[in-house]
Amino acid sequence: MREHPSTRVDFRSDTVTQPTAAMRKTMAVAPVGDDVLGDDATVIALQERVATMFGKEAGLFVASGTMANAIALRTHTVPGDEIVCDKTAHIYRYEGGGYAALCGASVALVDGEKGLMTAEQVRNAVRKAEGSGSHYPNGSLVCVENTSNLGGGTCYDLNTLDDISSAAREMGCATHLDGARIFNAAAATGVDVARMCAGYDSVSICFSKGLGAPVGSVLVGSRNFVQNAHRWRKMFGGGWRQAGLLAAACAHALDHHVERLADDHARARTIAEGLNRLPEFTVDMATVQTNMVYVDCRSPAKDIVANLAAHGIDVLDTGAHRVRFVVHLHITDEDVTKLLSVCASQWPVESS
């Protein structure tokens, strides 16, 4: 699948995806209402569908994954609480400090392996105000990110997910799963999303990354949780009117763009294996589990980015000597071949 207006090959992120022609047609004819008044049938249908799919009672359609996470954190916590997450977690690194500004919460960071925590690390990280002489914040929420972006697109195994949620409950903590790319995790592990999230009180699911919708995330949880989350969505300015146009795109993505994620994963692995053959690049193959490839470079990353850009290929530098490639529905086998060909010509194997 290509269906992208640009001739450039864009590996910067799976957020660069644009609606396909079929998705646009679905959006154009979607019945809409006023979601603030609760009568947008397409939004209602999406919320119910996603909640059922994830084994939860209710869902809330919001504008972005960051908004879904912010609402979840605020619903689960009160000011002065502490949130446990991995040191690479998106809620800590890339959401503008919302946990502090919007929730009044602090974070306890876990030094996970490739972005993945263990239950024992979670137990050791949770602090409770009670019994501390009021010295500690109150650890009340454990957040897991699956897949882990900065981990390289890595996935939790089911036993670890279950162990973490059990440990959190033992410590008196709620649990939230940041599932921005949870369908990638499901495709890679073969675990159904409802089973994967069974131990988690809330889950955020993004539709504007690998699934290719233009906008939208759904936050799922218990009916009471979603009722409370609805209030925070309003307070955060997230109420919207004829949102069914966007909900229709998300529903189309569920129908047509989930099974194909395995193709993205296969292409990512081809890229990783090809780059590893070149002395310029090093890829930790243990991290290449889904649609991301983080690459360490001998040369400055900004030079790699500029060189590839001159050949019509866009990538992101994520460190002084690190670049990232993300595969999505607009990337074809031909694009992968072009990338590897350009890299082989620009940074060839040194002759002996």
Residue spans for each PLM region:
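Conserved PLP-enzyme active-site core in the AAT-like
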Residues: R2-A30, D34-R298, K302-H311, V315-I331, ...
